[in-house]
């Protein structure tokens, strides 16, 4: 614990260190996991081991929707934030919100970031077929379209690396008992998948 606190403190005092806000829901927060095993700490360690000097700020809130993220954004954007990774939309999907609602909220988030000169990356969410093919297409298209419109770094979904290639279903061995949230191994798989994109995003900030 002492070592962990020292490392965090060392990161915090580096004036020239890039600081990234991870704006998301329970997946970002690290729901159901020990703090060290959550997405943000594991990604922090992955980036550090891959020669990327960055401090990740955990802005994940369990159950948060795109509207909740939008409402929290302003006070989370402290002057030292250099970039934001937006990973919202999963709870909109679970609640069956109209894709237009989700898109509008995300547009407001990225417009606000753009107006402040803050670069962003977006992690998409892929809809199942439960709501029908038209809903799925409209929802799935939101994220790549926004990435193109706002020039965002883009990851298609946290869950892509959790899919078993043989069954084409998410592997239950990578999920917690609730069948929704990733376990420790699931988080490791997610970080290995998204890490290179986030690394490139951070590298782009140093070139601005």
Q: Locations of the language-model features?
A:
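Bacterial N-terminal signal peptides
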Residues: 1-9
């Amino acid at each position: 614990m002492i070592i962990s606190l020292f490392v965090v403190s060392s990161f915090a005092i580096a004036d020239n260190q890039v600081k990234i806000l991870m704006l998301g829901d329970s997946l970002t927060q690290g729901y159901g996991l020990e703090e060290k095993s959550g997405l943000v700490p594991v990604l922090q360690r992955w980036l550090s081991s891959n020669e990327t000097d960055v401090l990740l700020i955990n802005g994940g809130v369990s159950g948060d929707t795109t509207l909740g993220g939008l409402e929290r954004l302003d006070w989370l954007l402290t002057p030292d934030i250099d970039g934001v990774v937006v990973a919202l939309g999963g709870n909109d999907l679970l609640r069956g919100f109209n894709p237009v609602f989700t898109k509008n909220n995300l547009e407001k988030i990225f417009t606000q970031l753009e107006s402040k000169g803050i670069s962003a990356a977006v992690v998409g969410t892929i809809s199942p077929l439960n709501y029908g093919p038209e809903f799925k297409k409209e929802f799935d298209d939101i994220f790549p379209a926004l990435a193109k419109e706002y020039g965002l770094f883009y990851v298609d979904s946290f869950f892509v690396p959790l899919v078993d290639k043989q069954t084409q279903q998410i592997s239950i061995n990578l999920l917690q008992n609730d069948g929704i949230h990733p376990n420790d191994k699931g988080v490791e798989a997610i970080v290995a998948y998204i890490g290179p994109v986030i690394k490139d995003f951070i590298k782009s900030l140093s070139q601005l």
